[in-house]
Amino acid sequence: MVDGVMILPVLVMIAFPFPSMEDEKPKVNPKLYMCVCEGLSCGDEAHCEGQQCFSSLSINDGFHVYQKGCFQVYEQGKMTCKTPPSPGQAVECCQGDWCNRNITAQLPTKGKSFPGTQNFHLEVGLIILSVVFAVCLLACLLGVALRKFKRRNQERLNPRDVEYGTIEGLITTNVGDSTLADLLDHSCTSGSGSGLPFLVQRTVARQITLLECVGKGRYGEVWRGSWQGENVAVKIFSSRDEKSWFRETELYNTVMLRHENILGFIASDMTSRHSSTQLWLITHYHEMGSLYDYLQLTTLDTVSCLRIVLSIASGLAHLHIEIFGTQGKPAIAHRDLKSKNILVKKNGQCCIADLGLAVMHSQSTNQLDVGNNPRVGTKRYMAPEVLDETIQVDCFDSYKRVDIWAFGLVLWEVARRMVSNGIVEDYKPPFYDVVPNDPSFEDMRKVVCVDQQRPNIPNRWFSDPTLTSLAKLMKECWYQNPSARLTALRIKKTLTKIDNSLDKLKTDC
């Protein structure tokens, strides 16, 4: 019987031989080729650089959509290039400078067979014959061998593997079924690690079912959607806010932004529904909604208050700092930080969303990438230098200081909802008592620049050590002189110190 068990893997290896090492062996110092780039994913660029070039043709709502581009890493295009053409999509790949210039992918026609299709059918036939051969040889041994294998496997299985077989927020499935967790994990270990390959993004986007609208605004709508049983958020931009969609898509696909306090990006796509073009941005779904909505319904204790503000500061510090190396990122300023652009997660932390106005800066090139978006930030959260138009628009630090001003206002919103001595204030937006619900630019300029007013600090805060520390911190975010304001990293360290002192106080008690 032991012999039978030993024979089983040998015969399976005969039936399903491993790919040759020649095919799988990674290339040392792979050569990069210049490729023609045409289509939505190219932006304003007419070329790109990668290890493989491609030309594709797909059918979208009855229209032929042609695209050309490159796979930065050979493995990215490996499966795509080997896939035989289908009636709805065909991809041709090549290696060499500008090799895809004169290549046009063609969809298969009746009676016409492609070499890739013939090889595919041949491989399938060989596999079927191998399987039949293996089954005939193993018919007598299979039952007992499988029974023994199952028994041994169950003895080794840790009960926790069954109980905790999910990743937070993303459902795991059987081997062979792609999940968001699989796709996102792969995106962090191949290519730039910044996002899914464009062809994968389009596949995910077209398999999503919209379930319910969870928010509306001037930018468009946010829907809860479903992809293979998993909840996702779908932000559908209005046509007038196309630049914001393009900016977020560009930023997420070129920058390593994976951080627990930055909203997780999944895919972006331009699709057609009800005879109109829709711009989709697909992200992780957080059912608790925005911080703005959360604070109106929920009061906070000291621990939950600090968890919220520290997580926001951590996300902002990650945006502001430049990280060097292959898994690095440029420094980024948000430019529209507010409680409506911050989402609350199940664990009580927050993540920063809406990067449609973001500005990027790289020290190595000293280039400031402001983007091409006519949209401006939210007037209620604008810093004095923005309102009086004295901001140095060619200096990246100026944009970071604008974020710090806005963070101070968000900190004030959160602190008002923290209960101390049984007292708590109702939720109110910043400057609620001196400007109307939808303040104009002039309204805010008079209050912030001319009168130099700041949000009111309630007296009860000074009887609570945590609120006293938070009040001091927010005041240091509101200096009229931008260069005097704290940095995001300093704010994060200060909040961590406040949090640690609270833990120490609990331990001493």
Curated annotation (Swiss-Prot):
It is an enzyme of class 2 (transferase). GO terms for molecular function: activin receptor activity, type I; ATP binding; metal ion binding; SMAD binding; transforming growth factor beta binding; transforming growth factor beta receptor activity, type I. Residues 147-509 are cytoplasmic. Interacts with FKBP1A. Interacts with FCHO1. Interacts with CLU. Interacts with type II receptors AMHR2 and ACVR2A. Interacts with BMP7. Interacts with BMP9. Interacts with BMP6 (when glycosylated); the interaction may induce HAMP expression. Interacts with TSC22D1/TSC-22. PANTHER family: ACTIVIN RECEPTOR TYPE-1, TRANSFORMING GROWTH FACTOR-BETA RECEPTOR TYPE I AND II. The active site is at D336 (proton acceptor). It comes from Bos taurus. Residues 208-502 form the Protein kinase domain. This is Activin receptor type-1. The keyword Disulfide bond does not apply. Keywords: ATP-binding, Glycoprotein, Kinase, Magnesium, Manganese, Membrane, Metal-binding, Nucleotide-binding, Phosphoprotein, Receptor, Serine/threonine-protein kinase, Signal, Transferase, Transmembrane, Transmembrane helix. The gene is ACVR1. Bone morphogenetic protein (BMP) type I receptor that is involved in a wide variety of biological processes, including bone, heart, cartilage, nervous, and reproductive system development and regulation. As a type I receptor, forms heterotetrameric receptor complexes with the type II receptors AMHR2, ACVR2A ors ACVR2B. Upon binding of ligands such as BMP7 or BMP9 to the heteromeric complexes, type II receptors transphosphorylate ACVR1 intracellular domain. In turn, ACVR1 kinase domain is activated and subsequently phosphorylates SMAD1/5/8 proteins that transduce the signal. It is a single-pass type I membrane protein. One of its GO terms (biological process) is heart development. ATP binds at V214, G215, K216, G217, R218, Y219, G220, E221, V222, K235. It is found in: Membrane. Residues 1-20 form the signal peptide. Belongs to the protein kinase superfamily. TKL Ser/Thr protein kinase family. TGFB receptor subfamily. Residues 21-123 are extracellular. The keyword Manganese applies. Its cofactor is Mg(2+); Mn(2+). The modification Phosphoserine is found at S501. InterPro entries: Activin_recp, GS_dom, Kinase-like_dom_sf, Prot_kinase_dom, Protein_kinase_ATP_BS, Ser/Thr_kinase_AS, Snake_toxin-like_sf, TGFB_receptor. The chain crosses the membrane at residues 124-146. GO terms for cellular component: activin receptor complex; BMP receptor complex; plasma membrane. Glycans are attached at N102.
